[in-house]
Amino acid sequence: MTEILTSDDMRSLERAAIASGRASGLELMERAGAAVVEAIAEAWPDIRPPAVALRHAMILCGPGNNGGDGFVVARLLRRRGWKVTLYLYGEADRLPPDARANHDRWRRIGTIAPLPAAPDFSSADLVVDALFGLGLTRPLTGFGPIFAALASAGRPVLAIDLPSGRDADARADAAGWPSAPCSLAVTFHREKPAHAQLRAEGIGVIVKPIGL
């Protein structure tokens, strides 16, 4: 039987890896971003440069380490020839240290715009949802127009860990929380309780190792 980890379990594993010196937080973030880019190439080979003309990824980065993963994805996709548009929800000065480091690395090669209230996703070949991951403990407010715009655009959406708005631990009281549309979720090391719900809804789930 496949092992399922709660969000607390996953954070404990990451902290243990960092404390033991087996990996730094930055290294884990880099591995996660690289795993997402690998999953993109596997899931959508038809939109992978250079086999086709320049492709456009829109990446939505949030205020935590999920957003940090998104900055890594942006940098690595650009290196592979993608056009990248990156939006940040929140203030750069309030990002956790590892996420801020990857924000700064991206800023040296690309631009960052504040996340609009209702973005236009019509030009995107792929949207990466790196807004909120495993740490969400409350329903999101104010994201309805963003999620609606994403749904109406009909573009492929890859979520890092989980679609933003989902509770990783699938608690009963979180069943009605609003969440982003999603085509594929890429999570790391092991599935979390919410991934069974995604599969039941016909959403793809890929688990990638990051050396934990």
Swiss-Prot record:
Keywords: Isomerase, Metal-binding, NAD, NADP, Nucleotide-binding, Potassium. This is NAD(P)H-hydrate epimerase. The lineage of its organism: Bacteria, Pseudomonadati, Pseudomonadota, Alphaproteobacteria, Rhodobacterales. It is an enzyme of class 5 (isomerase). NCBIfam families: yjeF_nterm (TIGR00197). Catalyzes the epimerization of the S- and R-forms of NAD(P)HX, a damaged form of NAD(P)H that is a result of enzymatic or heat-dependent hydration. This is a prerequisite for the S-specific NAD(P)H-hydrate dehydratase to allow the repair of both epimers of NAD(P)HX. Belongs to the NnrE/AIBP family. Its cofactor is K(+). InterPro entries: YjeF_N_dom, YjeF_N_dom_sf. It holds the Pfam family YjeF_N. It catalyses: (6R)-NADHX = (6S)-NADHX; (6R)-NADPHX = (6S)-NADPHX. Binds 1 potassium ion per subunit. (6S)-NADPHX binds at residues 65-69, 133-139, 161.
